[in-house]
Amino acid sequence: SDKEKLWGLGEKGIIFEPFQSRIYTHSNLFSHVVGQVDYDNFGVSGVEKYFDKELKNNKLINTPLELTLDSNIQYLIHKELNQALVTFDATGAGAVLMNVENGDILSLVSLPDFNINLRNNLKDTKYTNKITKGVYELGSIFKTFTVALALDNNLVKPQTVLKNIPRSVRCSKYEISDIKDFPKNLSVEDILIRSSNIGTLLIAKKIGELKYKKFLEDANLLKTPEIELEEVGNPIKFNWNKCKLETVSYGHGITTTPLQAVTVYAAIANGGKMITPNIVKNKNKKKNIRLISERTSESINKILRKVVTTDEGTAKLADIHGYYVGGKTGTSQNYKDHNQNLNTFISIFPSNKPKYVLLVMLEDPKVAKNLVYDYKGMKIKAFRNEAGWNSVYVAGKIIKKIGPILAINNKEFRHQ
């Protein structure tokens, strides 16, 4: 061995001292969650830092700190996201899978990641935990919140038709429009299915600024997220000036973390109760606060299913047989660099009785010119760059892979 060779030199100045070092068997797989310790075994990131005192407490040495994450699911999602970086030439990606009933996070992946066995000082922002610390304008993901709030206040019903919807709306010095032409008359349900900006902002005007602000506060979208990690982001503060209600209604001019957005989707899916996301098992749960009614939750879940199943929907590639996927897409510009897209898809499944919510996001994905999509038995190419053609596609592949594992682990899900 190298030690024996050095010892054989007979140099008195060579001394061997034993030392302890933490070795992580999964290297990159849980890098943003587990985090790192430094050479003195002090936690410097992730769970290692958040629970540094507990992990060093000799009285707790025999008490394991057990996480909610599933290694098999984490591996599969990590693999699909890495493939997505190549397929869509994206600069980054992220995903989080959460149990909608209790907030347990089964998987959390942020790319690029790093080998936590290498004690590097990772200051480059590309290694930021995109799910918990990344702060973004998430775009049309917010349209679900707008429709849910309007339904909950009995201002509209899913089949309420908004007539003579204009092609564009002038608000102060801005002109707001849709990316394509829609019929002049659309039901509330169709507005969400087709993802109409104009239709959504007209619904928001019925709600009003005060009620919308209260919803955002109740949904914890305007404050630092709660999670057992040091790496959390602060949504950028803003003033409710002219046009803010209109733009916030479809997810522009407001920032939040993906973790917060997926937590609100969990509440909408689970019957309307807010939950606290967590990565540590058997944590004392906070009392759930009602965000929307069960009736509203049921209505939204049905609409989100149609976003996936109807020809007009924006998430058709997520219609994986047997899993009753519902969800909403979001295609937005990076608020720091308007030349880059952020494409997001938040899915719930099974939508008839939701158990899980999955967020998939891709940073600056490009058109996959050589990719052949399998859509309703047809092989097609689509030279398009919206979330429906990348983030949705990736989410569908993930659900197809992890679905059997979740079905095995959850008997109730298996019989849906």
Model segments located where?
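Structural motif corresponding to the C-terminal cap of alpha-helices
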Residues: E80-F88, D113, N154, V308, ...
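Carboxylate/His-rich catalytic cores and anion/metal-binding grooves
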Residues: H32, Y39-Y50, T91-V109, Y212
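Amphipathic, well-packed alpha-helical segments that form the structural scaffold of globular domains
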Residues: V34, D38, D52, K56, ...
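Beta-lactam-recognizing serine transpeptidase/beta-lactamase-like catalytic domain environment
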Residues: A95, N99-S140, F145-M378, A382, ...
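Conserved, well-ordered alpha-helix/loop/beta-strand core segments that scaffold catalytic motifs
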Residues: L55-A93, E101
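Gram-negative outer-membrane assembly/targeting C-terminal domains
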Residues: A382, K400-Q416
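Small/polar-residue-rich segments within soluble enzyme cores
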Residues: S1-N62, L359-V360, K369-Y373, M378, ...
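A helicase ATPase "motif cassette" and its flanking acidic/Ser/Thr-rich regulatory loops
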Residues: I77, I191, A395
